[in-house]
Amino acid sequence: MQLFLLAALLSAAAALPIPLGQSGGSSSEQRFNLYAPQILPFFPPFPLPQAPLIPIPFPFPFDPNQVLTPNQLLELITSILNQLQGFLGR
């Protein structure tokens, strides 16, 4: 039993000391400092180059006010997908 008490006292004496500013009670800093400080994102000082726009030819003269029939809509979607397939290399 005495050996156990001696070991406990030695381990308590070897423990890191508590800074005086943090001792006693709980301050708001101790309660709310749960998360690491936020780091602002790094933005380069110059704009990054943009990818060139690829013109997608429409298979027919397109009027934005015109109502598309289902066949014209499928033809338009197929044309756009074919253009993208060639661009993506699939």
Swiss-Prot record:
- Keyword line: Secreted, Signal
Q: In which tissues is it expressed?
A: Expressed in enamel organ.
User: A single GO CC term, please?
Assistant: extracellular region
Where, subcellularly, is it found? Secreted
Signal peptide bounds: 1-15
The role this protein plays is: Tooth-associated epithelia protein that may participate in structuring the basal lamina at cell-tooth interface.
Name under which the protein is recorded:
Secretory calcium-binding phosphoprotein proline-glutamine-rich 1
